Amino acid sequence: MALANTRPVSGSIQWTGTGVGKAHTGTLKVTQGSITMKGKDVVGGEFTMDMNTIDYKNAKLVGHLKSPDFFEVSKFPTAKFVTKSVTALKGDASGATHQISGDLTIRDQTHPIAFKVKISEAGDQLRAQGDIVIEDRTKYGIKYNSKKVFDVAKLGDKLIEDEIKLSLDVSTSK
């Protein structure tokens, strides 16, 4: 029986938030994390996002995202994902090789989430790439201009959709 070993990861996340007639896409750094291997199989992992690294071309928006209206970075400087299960996929139409299920914590609110990743090897690097969809940001206490919290008619073009899309790209040495 192969023993599990844990390897450190680094990487980044591209995020996209949308509102009426607009979309904003920026980045966020993965500052800590690990992938757990058993032989050649990925069996677990976790990663921490430094919310202070939220970046976008508009400094005013970045400041607002870091404020209590959104991520309240001064109080909640990190967000974290911890894997609960990893399932190998065969022949997935999207090209994904694994289904990952786990717990995502943002603003000290933890909820289960599942997403597909493509795990690939190149040289001495193991890389995981995938898209994560947070369907309801209000579950994490991010309620600013949400249609679930505020009157849509009053929000008008100030409405911000509740879905947040994240594109994960992390890697580790084999």
Where are these regions (language model features)?
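Low-complexity, acidic/polar, glycine-enriched regions of mature
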Residues: 1-174
